Amino acid sequence: MPEILNHTLILEKIKNLGASPGCYLWKSKKGEVLYVGKAKNLDKRVRSYLKENHPDVKTKVLQREIFDLDWIATGTEKEALILEATLIKKHNPRFNVRLKDDKKYPYICVSLSEPYPMVYVTRKLKDNGDRYFGPYSDVKSTRETLDIILRIFPVRKTRQVLPLPRPRRPCLNFDMGRCLGPCQGNIPVEDYKVIIDQVIQFLEGRKESLVSDLNIKMSNASERLDFEKAARYRDMLQRIQNFREKQTVVSLEGGDEDVIGFARKQDEGQVILLEIRGGRLETKKSFPIQGVLDAENSEILGAFFRDYYLNASLVPPCIFIPADIQDEVIPVIDVLQEKTGFRPKIKFPKGGDKRSLLKIAEKNAELGLSERLLATHYRDQTASLKEIQEMFSLERLPHIIECYDISHFQGSQPVASGVMFVEGKPFKQGYRKYNIQGYEGINDPGMIHEVISRRLQRIINEEGVFPDLIVIDGGLTQLTKACEAAVEAGAEGIPMVGLAKKREEIFFPGENEPFIFDMNSPGMKLLRHLRDEAHRFGVSHHRSRRNKETMRSLIQEVPDIGFKRSKLLLQHFSGEKKIEEATKEELLLVPGIGENLAEKILKQLQKKE
């Protein structure tokens, strides 16, 4: 049996499902909606989740949290698709692939419900006859598009309800020729509607027909000697031309197309949508995707296709996709055909110009995802550093943190490691290995004193930069010796703390009792990462040193080899493992090693095995 908490109750519920299409909702013990899905046959689809040893990793994880089942039957699969999108928006289930914050995507609204419509940015969609264009991927790009419209078309910008009971004094936009003054009653509703129709043409991407229409209107106005109106059309044409000159021509065919690029990493995904209108790249939209871990690319792209195009104000005749997901998108295409009256073509090009466009979209998706993950990491790391600053009452943010650890085997071959984190990330160029020189036996505090002394003296001699914080892997005794070394070096101002492994206790200089902070806080997670990295690096160095010395002593037992030749061997092969794997011919390449000595070395190495 799969690990479903309330398996018996769910089996009873399934008996009432039937074979109708609809949506199902898996719920947790607390009533949280975990996953929303749609099905042609509810009974068959829901039973598939009850399989033992399910091949899908994501479903296995979901099974462990399932406690209850709810469902809604629909008349058709198309109705189920629309309902699925609505339920995902409503419940935001964590096991569904979904657009990040899709409820908040902005649109441009043309308020056709008013006699003198406005054009503005909104996140709220009303069913009152207004036209909405979008969704746009972010409010910045939406406002940039709105700004272009308001510079090209002389539409009103005030939010007053028009017409006013009494005409008012026109605003500065009227004086500058950027508004036709509907608040003053200067323009009839019919004439203003002509301008609004042109705005809609622009937003629909029909700029060629818009330019042609404006040219005709300009000529007609000139023939009627209406030079003021002709000048207005001329200015609009010039602004549209200036806008179009900034757009890149990507298709000589001059068609309207959407090109979708996709990238993923860890649990995050990124979709880039290139809107090509009239053969020109008009808009690049970027959509973060959540919940992609363990999901197939077809599922992710299918979810995006559903969430985006079921809410899109305009759907082009052709959509290019980066993977063959026909099965996932056909139900969406069926719904779009009912809504728009035409069936958009879905293509997966494998070569030619369209494949090149897909690669551009995919490259942009990769860059966008990398930038977003970097920003998220930087934000998280900054939060961790701020917390460490507060924990230790540091004067400034600990941009540079170093950590030191001692490694030895019952006091033999003692080494130390020092690692450096810059802005919360490992900085490998700042890693240091130390062979302990002044101590033998088990004396970790003394060894820490030596290493900190050597490190600080080197910074002073080289006029380097002191770290903002030094973390000692150990307790109060080790920390005390590290502080003594800092005082002796004249660098007592460097903040130092000790981090003991046993209970993740933090020791402060001069404090006998340790402090315990929240182990799962961002600051403590970063400190543990730092300490564990120092330990890993130290153990690796200690193992290498032990192996080297073991090999050297083993080779030195060979008659006639001596210290000098054993050193030459180690230098020539640059590693103990390579010596162990060396053939007689390879040994003969080492200066001072003849056939007789090479055979003795091989015999000695066989003893080790």
Swiss-Prot record:
It is found in: Cytoplasm. InterPro entries: GIY-YIG_endonuc (IPR000305), GIY-YIG_endonuc_sf (IPR035901), GIY-YIG_UvrC_Cho (IPR047296), Hlx-hairpin-Hlx_DNA-bd_motif (IPR003583), RuvA_2-like (IPR010994), UVR_dom (IPR001943), UVR_dom_sf (IPR036876), UvrABC_protein_C (IPR050066). This is UvrABC system protein C. Belongs to the UvrC family. GO terms for cellular component: cytoplasm; excinuclease repair complex. The keyword Zinc-finger does not apply. GO terms for biological process: DNA damage response; nucleotide-excision repair; SOS response. One of its GO terms (molecular function) is DNA binding. It comes from the Bacteria. Keywords: Cytoplasm, DNA damage, DNA excision, DNA repair, Excision nuclease, SOS response. Interacts with UvrB in an incision complex. It holds the Pfam family UVR. Residues 19-97 form the GIY-YIG domain. SMART domains: GIYc, HhH1. CDD domains: GIY-YIG_UvrC_Cho. It comes from Leptospira interrogans serogroup Icterohaemorrhagiae serovar Lai (strain 56601). The UvrABC repair system catalyzes the recognition and processing of DNA lesions. UvrC both incises the 5' and 3' sides of the lesion. The N-terminal half is responsible for the 3' incision and the C-terminal half is responsible for the 5' incision. Coiled coil: none annotated. Residues 208-243 form the UVR domain.
